[in-house]
Amino acid sequence: MPRNSTNKQMAVLSFIHKQVDAHGYPPTVREICGAVGLSSTSTVHGHINRLIKKGYLKKDPSKPRALEITPAGLEVLGITPKQTQIPLLGVVAAGEPILAVQDATDFFPIPPSIPDHDDLFMLTIQGTSMINIGILNGDKVIVRRQETANNGDIVIAMTSDNEATCKRFFKEQGHIRLQPENDTLAPIILDDVTILGKVVGLFRDDIF
């Protein structure tokens, strides 16, 4: 295929992505014509069909203008896909630490209150050690994946025994203190921990 034709295909793909990203729906064929410098709508249809065959676009035949950029299409454009759902990875203890299950069991939409959508996951809390700040047994916490934390952050931490726990993080002289938010429980004192992420949100199935 001539290089010019391939370049036009990439221009079409890029314009479709920009329009969907900005407006939530793809452009019309005539809008694509104007954006990429083509006068023939049939030529644009040809480029779209070839992009579909290459796996860069997909189309819902039951809906008009229902073009969607595929992961392969984003990759060829050099674009990292945005995370649109949060995977629920399992259970983490908010009392005695237990092993974290690293397989997604469900997916939840990202709340609009969380502007940065990248590297999020959810874990179900088991225990009552964080009840003073309203994290209850059975709640699901939204976690942003990161390896560092500031003193006072609520984190998901992995201990040297490969057990995960939700606590408030404090780095002190000679040790790490994982502080529960429950007046009846003592802190966990460790030489070192691995930070899996910072808690940035909360989801509760039942409010009564």
UniProtKB/Swiss-Prot annotation:
UniProt GO MF annotations: DNA binding; serine-type endopeptidase activity
Classification via Gene3D superfamilies: Umud Fragment, subunit A, Winged helix-like DNA-binding domain superfamily/Winged helix DNA-binding domain
EC code(s) of this entry: 3.4.21.88
GO biological process, one term: DNA repair
DNA-binding segment(s): 29-49
EC class (word): hydrolase
Keyword set includes Transcription regulation: yes
Keyword entries, A-Z: Autocatalytic cleavage, DNA damage, DNA repair, DNA replication, DNA-binding, Hydrolase, Repressor, SOS response, Transcription, Transcription regulation
Catalytic activity: Hydrolysis of Ala-|-Gly bond in repressor LexA
Active-site residues per Swiss-Prot or TrEMBL entry: S129, K167
SUPFAM superfamilies in the cross-refs: LexA/Signal peptidase, Winged helix' DNA-binding domain
This protein's record includes keyword Thylakoid: no
One family name in Pfam for this protein: Peptidase_S24
Domain of life of the native organism: Bacteria
Site (Cleavage): A94, G95
Similarity field: Belongs to the peptidase S24 family.
HAMAP family linked: LexA
Subunit structure: Homodimer.
Purpose: Represses a number of genes involved in the response to DNA damage (SOS response), including recA and lexA. In the presence of single-stranded DNA, RecA interacts with LexA causing an autocatalytic cleavage which disrupts the DNA-binding part of LexA, leading to derepression of the SOS regulon and eventually DNA repair.
PANTHER family attached to this UniProt entry: LEXA REPRESSOR, LEXA REPRESSOR-RELATED
Protein name listed in UniProt: LexA repressor
Organism for this UniProt entry: Limosilactobacillus fermentum (strain NBRC 3956 / LMG 18251) (Lactobacillus fermentum)
Gene name of this polypeptide: lexA
